[in-house]
UniProtKB/Swiss-Prot annotation:
Subcellular location as annotated: Mitochondrion
UniProt cross-references to InterPro entries, sorted A to Z: 2-oxoA_DH_lipoyl-BS, Biotin_lipoyl, GCV_H, GCV_H/Fam206, GCV_H_sub, Single_hybrid_motif
Main location: mitochondrion
Gene name linked to the record: GDH3
Cofactor(s) it depends on: (R)-lipoate
SUPFAM superfamilies reported for this sequence: Single hybrid motif
Presence of the UniProt keyword Transport in the record: no
NCBIfam families: gcvH (TIGR00527), PRK01202.1 (NF002270)
Summary of activators and inhibitors of this protein: Inhibited by harpin, S-nitrosoglutathione (GSNO), nitric oxide, N-ethylmaleimide and 5,5'-dithiobis-(2-nitrobenzoic acid).
Gene Ontology biological-process annotations: glycine decarboxylation via glycine cleavage system
Highest rank taxon of the organism: Eukaryota
Name listed for the protein in its UniProt record: Glycine cleavage system H protein 3, mitochondrial
Length: 166
């Protein structure tokens, strides 16, 4: 019993979380420093979007850090399928109880799928930013743009420095 309590308090202090329910989608554990989760296997933009590249498809959403700063998301505006997105250009908006923010595309390409669940349940961005709260799936037009994005360690450091400056 004492060991279980110690393990639980240690996990809480380190902000370790298990994603056993969807282990086929994400790494078994993610480490959260201070404020939000940053996952291995994803790329990150300095505008706080993430990209998961699998084969010829890149899934895009906003990071846990971004949704945490936005607060409760109440409305999402997304592009239509078969439209194009351009790197560092707006493809939609997220309205929260705090503000409305444009969402910038971290890469260029053709939108092949839009997460229509967000129309009825925009809060999925808060509860599951890396799984159920994804926004669009894109066929990338420039693989070099993916390589230019930050990895998890770089993004964590970027967020820490950005938060320290504010």
């Amino acid at each position: 019993m004492a060991l279980r309590m110690w393990a639980s308090s240690t996990a809480n202090a380190l902000k370790l979380s298990s994603s056993a329910s969807k282990s086929h989608l994400l790494p078994a554990f993610s480490i959260s420093r201070c404020f939000s989760s940053v996952l291995e296997g994803l790329k990150y933009a300095n505008s706080h979007e993430w990209v998961k590249h699998e084969g010829s498809v890149a899934t895009i959403g906003i990071t846990d850090h971004a949704q945490d700063h936005l607060g409760e998301v109440v409305f999402v505006e997304l592009p239509e399928a078969n439209s194009s997105v351009s790197k560092e250009k707006s493809f939609g908006a997220v309205e929260s109880v705090k503000a409305t923010s444009e969402i910038l595309s971290p890469i260029s390409g053709e939108v092949i799928e839009v997460n229509t669940k967000l129309t009825e349940s925009p809060g999925l961005i808060n509860s599951s930013p890396y799984e159920d709260g994804w926004m669009i799936k894109v066929k990338p037009s420039s693989p070099a743009e993916l390589e230019a994005l930050m990895g998890p360690k770089e993004y964590t450091k970027f967020c820490e420095e950005e938060d320290a400056a504010h």
